[in-house]
Amino acid sequence: MPARHIHTIARPANRVVIVGAGLSGLSAALHLRGTGADVTIVERASAPGGRVGAYEGPGGSYRIDSGATVLTMPGLIDEALAAVGSDRARTGLVIRQLAPAYHGRFADGTTIDVHSDPEAMEHEVRRACGAAEATRYRELRAWLGAMFDTEYDRFIAANFDSPLDLANSPSAFRDMARLIALGGFSRLGKQVAKRIEDPRLRRIFTFQALYAGMPPARALGVYGAIAHMDTSLGVYFPDGGMHRITEALAAALIEAGGSIHYNTEITGLEHSGSTITAATTAEGHRIPGDAFILTGDLPITDQLLARTPARIPRRATRWSPSAFILHGTIPQSVTGLWDAQAHHTIDFGDAWDSTFEQLTARRGKGTVMSDPSLLITRPTLTSPAMVADGATGPRELLSVLAPAPNLVSAPLAWDALEPSYQAELLGTLERRGYKGISEHFAVDHVDSPRTWAAQGMAAGTPFSAAHSFPQTGPFRRRNLVRGVDNVVLAGCGTTPGVGVPTTMISGRLAAQRITGAP
């Protein structure tokens, strides 16, 4: 795709200050450092990570991912490392593809493995659903791939200055026309249902809409691109855990001459007219810069911008659903008896559309899922070195994620609800065949909407603004801040949106707003 002109900050910038050492901040820093910029990251936590961090078990007995567990498009990590002449080998980062990407279990007792290899997946669909559905799977895969290929360069991995950018040239117009012809602005659930008949496969190829904060029945067809990433491009996992990604990116930045200040919270921005001149810390220290990238959650970012000339958008935001997550360990002698032996297992409840309505209901109308679909993640199966020692034998790491309504949809008293809901979920898994999980799963960390709200995340969700049409593409919160000359946003609240790949891209797009590089 030909490079198009984009607006950049108003003046050249050699010194760039980045607030936040998560994926977007580190991605931006590496791309900027690769152009010779003097880059400083300021991070309030004691280590890099953000939404890709880690918890420590009791006494430091293990480390388990505290955020994202699904990695797709690892080439974006390579791209960021390459910006400063580094690579995975240099940083000690080892990434392995999962096979299967997911193991799907259904309420009727059947299972379907999800493979990125087309032949392997076709064989699995034929086994589980019959020959006719295997043929239809190939048609669906082609449609998902066409959707991804049509939108990626122009609509995902590019900066927008205006909705007019969607059709501001003959090539852009052609891409938009093709996106419309593919059904990109109809509903994802409807488009998938046109191509495959088995309700289990429909779930496998549409549940990813929840990553974008939308039920499959209401998500736009363009979000078939997420399903393509998940089911065709492959799911991966780094040795040692997802947090190894941010550790590797941070190490590459330091080696390239960048700097990171940990345990340092930015609480203000100084300005002269419309130019931000320095970030100020909670201790009162000044960190001057020529340009600033803010990667925090939107409420925190807007609080920083509130005392500057920045024009903060006032329109109401619709927030994504949240999550309730249990982290801990369980004896391998228990898990070894389970039928499911996969890194990621999606254990689908019988209900489907009704559970999404519970999760995404309007203000005050939401509830927890009455028949939950759950993500069970067992990283030790892929990275055995992560195993924890137990008094009676080795214990594997285990995370159980239940989608949950956000605090706007359902202002639940999670402090009181957490113990009973934890017991309810473990009881559900016990009945579904995960024998011993109620008794033997030592839960060391519980995350709920209360957790995310305490960290400054709006509506108590780590998934930020939902990808409804008014919050998608050029209609999403713009990364170039109006009213000030030299501030750019990055992270899941701005373009292109939520997810590990898109957050990495947002960092690169923020860097481009400073350098003007394509």
Language-model features, listed with the residues they occupy:
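Helical element adjacent to the flavin cofactor pocket in flavoenzyme catalytic cores
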Residues: 225-276
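Rossmann-like flavin
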Residues: 107-218
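N-terminal glycine-rich phosphate/pyrophosphate-binding loop and immediately adjacent elements
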Residues: 10-153
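A conserved FAD-binding loop/helix module that cradles the flavin
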Residues: 68, 492-515
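Mid-domain catalytic core of redox enzymes
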Residues: 267-390
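FAD-dependent oxidoreductase catalytic-site/capping-region signature
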Residues: 375-467
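Extreme N-terminal leader/targeting segments of oxidoreductases
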Residues: 1-16, 34-35, 468-472
